[in-house]
């Protein structure tokens, strides 16, 4: 039994927490997981169903317009996993030394991606009206960090109640007081003209 433990211990991942700057050792484990050499590591946290609360405004629930139904938050580890899975699908082998620099180019140190799936959007043009960020609390008070970039996945479809699909937001926490193991309060505005500010909480200690 002790001999088996001695073999397994070197392959145990770090304590679970978001890695703002993914290191090579953890990247190797993410790649190994993508090739099924070890169990996959948790590289993202998903919230489904998405529990949303109102921070400001009246008559904001039910949503006066489109509504978010699912969220996913991830960092550099997810990018490494995606690159490794893409290579595997193309029957290629890649090493962490290859994909980690590319992952850091696509999603720099200290950055996160937030995926937000919507339902009931009346016009595709209204996707750009969504504003997402985080609310940070410190002893000096609170501040907001807005996503510096927003894109869309190619999963948009027209349903009976409007369009459904996924927005992707990019956030930069460089130099910000964010606990990689703690809760993160994500805030957003929808396309509605009502002054409604919504929020949901993400556990950064649930993924790498």
Predicted feature residues:
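Sec-dependent N-terminal signal peptides
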Residues: 4-15
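Conserved functional micro-motifs across diverse proteins
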Residues: 18-208
């Amino acid at each position: 039994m002790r001999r088996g433990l001695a073999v397994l211990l070197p392959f145990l991942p770090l304590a679970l927490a978001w890695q703002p700057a993914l290191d090579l050792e953890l990247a190797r484990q993410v790649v190994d997981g993508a090739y099924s050499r070890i169990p996959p590591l948790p590289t993202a946290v998903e919230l489904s169903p998405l529990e949303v609360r109102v921070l400001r405004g009246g008559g904001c629930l039910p949503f006066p317009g489109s509504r978010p139904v699912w969220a996913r938050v991830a960092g550099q580890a997810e990018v490494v996993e995606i690159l490794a899975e893409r290579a595997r699908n193309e029957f290629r082998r890649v090493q962490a030394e290859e994909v980690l620099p590319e992952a850091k180019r696509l999603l720099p140190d200290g950055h996160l991606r937030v995926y937000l799936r919507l339902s009931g959007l009346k016009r595709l043009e209204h996707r750009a009206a969504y504003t997402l960020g985080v609310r940070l609390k410190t002893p000096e008070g609170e501040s907001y960090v807005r996503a510096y970039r927003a894109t869309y996945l190619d999963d948009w479809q027209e349903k009976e109640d409007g369009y459904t699909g996924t927005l992707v937001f990019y956030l930069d926490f460089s130099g910000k007081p964010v606990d990689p193991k703690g809760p993160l309060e994500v805030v957003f505005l929808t396309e509605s003209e009502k002054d409604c500010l919504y929020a949901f909480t993400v556990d950064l200690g649930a993924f790498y």
